[in-house]
Structure formats: structure tokens, C-alpha cells
Design a protein with these regions (language model features):
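Bacterial peptidoglycan biogenesis and beta-lactam-recognition machinery
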Residues: 5-9, 57-62, 146-147, 156-165
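M16/insulysin-pitrilysin zinc metalloprotease superfamily fold
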Residues: 6-8, 39-70
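Non-catalytic beta-strand/loop surface segments
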Residues: 9-44, 80-135, 159-189
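Divalent metal-coordination and catalytic microenvironments
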Residues: 36, 52, 73, 123, ...
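Short beta-strand-to-loop capping motifs
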Residues: 38-40, 140-144
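Short amphipathic alpha-helices in soluble, non-transmembrane regions
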Residues: 50-54, 150-157
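Non-catalytic accessory/assembly modules
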Residues: 64-71, 84-92, 144, 151
Length: 189
């Protein structure tokens, strides 16, 4: 998710043209989806389509961008999961609730080393496996007609090649038949 803001081959600084157009953006990820969103004034809606399609088509993968974003995500992990009381409760509860299903693993990683050891090749593999127009949902709201939104979608996303996206086959979680408990004791100041 974070690398999507590192720029593309054509647009090295994703935020600069968006901010010049009066827009803002953000994103979030959970186990099922990554949601990127942006808001632009009506007169600059095509800028939003251009920016989103460009990074889907030609994201710039570089070690520098990976290192910058790795640092950001590691700090996010520390802030949310390590540096506040009960910050790791999700990390502790997930494996209790799920034994087989991938929901047992936190999206951000189970530990800092998962972030620290991610390679550029792994990131590229994930991107080229899942990031394609035929594996995306585009929602457009505001003062824009359906016809214009469809036209801009076809104009900006139509030329991007489809990819063979693997079918998501998640293992079913077995029915829980027993109580699961975890007692955590810590020295809290």
C-alpha cells in the first residue's frame, strides 16, 4: 500500500500534482482489500483518474522507495502495536480466533522482522499478481454523471493490460468446538 505513494515512472511525486489540483488522498489495508481514495475538486476529476491509472500501469519500484516506506510502516507498527497499552491485542487474539484461515495473520505483519525483511522482488511479485484493472473496484461519487465517469474510466484504465489474477481460494476455518484462552501478564509502569 505505502509504495503506491512513492511515485511512478511518469510521475515521480504522486502527491505534487494531486495537491496542485486541490486534492488529497490516503489509503488503508485489511486482510481482504486495500482501499486507495482521493478527493479532488469537480473541475480536476480527470487528474484523479490520470494519477490512479498511471500508478497502476507504471509504478516505480526502487530500493530507495522501499526503504523509505519500510521505515514508515515500521514506525506505524511500533506506534500502533508496541508503544501503547493493549496495542498488540489484535496480534494476540487473531491466532486464537483463527487456526487455519489467513485472518490469523495481521495485515501489517506479525512482527517487525516481517516488514524489515520484505524484499523488492516480493513487493513486485505481489503488485504484478494483484494490481490490475480487472481486479479493482472503482467507485466515483460527487458531481459527475455516470456517463462521464464511464468515459474517464475507459480512457484512463482501458489501455492498462488485464492480468491473470489468481483465484482467491481461502481455506475454511473449522468450527470451533472448544474454549480458547490466552493469559498475558506484563510489567506495566
Amino acid at each position: 500500500e505505502h509504495l503506491m505513494f512513492g511515485g511512478s515512472v511518469n510521475i515521480p511525486d504522486y502527491d505534487a500534482p494531486l495537491q496542485l489540483a486541490g486534492g488529497e488522498n490516503n489509503a488503508w489495508t485489511n486482510n481482504d482489500i486495500t482501499n486507495y481514495y482521493l478527493t479532488v475538486p469537480r473541475q480536476n476529476v480527470e487528474t484523479g483518474f490520470w494519477l490512479e491509472s498511471d500508478r497502476m500501469l507504471s509504478l516505480d519500484f526502487s530500493e530507495r522507495s522501499l526503504e523509505v516506506q519500510r521505515g514508515v510502516v515500521m514506525e506505524e507498527f511500533k506506534q500502533r502495536c508496541l508503544n501503547q497499552p493493549y496495542g498488540d491485542v489484535g496480534h494476540l487474539l487473531r491466532p486464537l480466533a483463527y487456526r487455519v484461515h489467513p485472518y490469523q495473520w495481521p495485515t501489517i505483519g506479525k512482527e517487525l522482522s516481517h516488514i524489515a525483511n520484505a524484499t523488492l522482488e516480493e513487493v513486485k511479485d505481489f503488485f504484478f499478481r494483484f494490481y490490475a484493472p480487472n481486479n479493482a473496484v472503482l467507485a466515483v461519487t460527487g458531481n459527475i454523471s455516470f456517463e462521464e465517469a464511464l468515459h474517464l474510466t475507459e480512457k484512463w484504465f482501458g489501455p492498462i493490460p488485464r492480468r491473470e489474477v489468481p483465484l482467491r481460494q481461502l481455506p475454511p476455518e473449522p468450527v470451533q468446538t472448544e474454549e480458547r484462552r490466552l493469559v498475558v501478564e506484563r510489567n506495566v509502569p
